A protein has these predicted regions:
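Acidic/histidine-rich catalytic neighborhood of metal-dependent amide-processing enzymes
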Residues: 111-179
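Acidic/His- and Gly-rich active-site-bordering loop/insert found
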Residues: 1-106, 131
Length: 180
């Protein structure tokens, strides 16, 4: 597997079901805490400045920041860390497996695959020459329920452009209604 696929497998193995939904056994999901800690460690290990943005008790957004040549410009890469319930899945939700070249597990498509790709993109930017604009990776909470993570993000962060890692059947979408 590639480094991005390896990262995706790690993320899928972490149960980050939104607390509004049941996880395995019917208890409320644990939320994004373990994914947030893993993302913070990934960024820190690569020397990327990290900011923890508290949103709810025990639930925080994680921001990774690569400075750009023009500090007045900013691009945000946004992906959420929570998933929906694994109820009804016919495979083990937190045991990632590759079949026919595709990695399967809860959150692989929505949206831990996008998060893994963005983490590696930011890591690549961090070791090269400074990009034209500051690049901020925003790993946010609560997209699957009430959008409280991205709502907090936009209260405190202005961006000239944003790339949101939501599945779109591989169609580029240049604008849509929403929070970001």
């Amino acid at each position: 597997m590639t480094a991005v696929a390896d990262t995706l497998a790690v993320l899928v193995a972490i149960d980050s079901v939104n607390p509004a939904y049941p996880t395995l056994g019917g208890a409320p999901g644990p939320g994004e805490g373990a994914v947030a800690a893993w993302v913070e460690q990934f960024l820190g290990d690569r020397g990327i400045r990290t900011v923890i943005q508290p949103v709810l008790p025990g639930r925080s957004n994680v921001l990774g920041i690569v400075p750009g040549r023009d500090p007045a410009r900013r691009v945000v890469l946004e992906a959420h860390m929570d998933t929906v319930s694994p109820a009804g899945m016919t495979i083990a939700p937190f045991a990632p497996r590759v079949e026919a070249g595709r990695l399967h597990g809860r959150g692989a498509c929505d949206v831990k695959g996008g998060l893994a790709a963005m983490l590696h993109a930011l890591a690549d930017l961090a070791v090269g020459p400074p990009p034209p604009a500051e690049v901020v990776l925003a790993a946010v909470i609560d997209e699957e329920h009430a959008f409280r993570g991205v709502s907090r993000l936009v209260e405190h962060l202005r961006a000239d452009r944003a790339v949101v890692a939501e599945p779109t059947d591989l169609r580029i979408v240049t604008a849509t209604k929403g929070v970001l």
